[in-house]
Amino acid sequence: MTFKRRNGGRNKHNRGHVNPIRCSNCGKCCPKDKAIKRFIVRNIVEQAAIRDVQEASVYEGYTLPKLYAKTQYCVSCAIHSHVVRVRSRTNRRVRTPPPRFARRKEDTPKPGQPGQAPRPAGPGAAAAAAPRV
């Protein structure tokens, strides 16, 4: 019989049984070695309020604490929330991690911002602009 993945979708090599965990999203029981695990590190304070909190702080140069959370997803929730993506048959064999997305540069103007030319009108724009009688 053909096989889809070299590891059978699990990380259980030479172990008979692995204890289950609960999915962080739906609560489904899933083997710990099969679950998709992500460690999330983010600021406790949201980006918009960081400056206000630092100005109100008594201590100079106080670094705000971070929030550390380990999330474990079942396969269906990880695919649904785009934590992992479905790959083609040939790309399933690729073991290198996917490239990280580079942050957008702040100096590039965004569409619709001042200083940018308006977008060209489409074919229906002339009909919509004409006055109705």
Swiss-Prot record:
GO terms for molecular function: mRNA binding; structural constituent of ribosome. GO terms for biological process: translation. Residues 86-95 have a biased composition (Basic residues). One of its GO terms (cellular component) is Golgi apparatus. PROSITE patterns: RIBOSOMAL_S26E (PS00733). Keywords: Ribonucleoprotein, Ribosomal protein. Residues 113-133 have a biased composition (Low complexity). InterPro entries: Ribosomal_eS26 (IPR000892), Ribosomal_eS26_CS (IPR047864), Ribosomal_eS26_sf (IPR038551). Residues 86-133 are annotated as: Disordered. PANTHER family: 40S RIBOSOMAL PROTEIN S26. Belongs to the eukaryotic ribosomal protein eS26 family. This is Small ribosomal subunit protein eS26z. It comes from Arabidopsis thaliana.
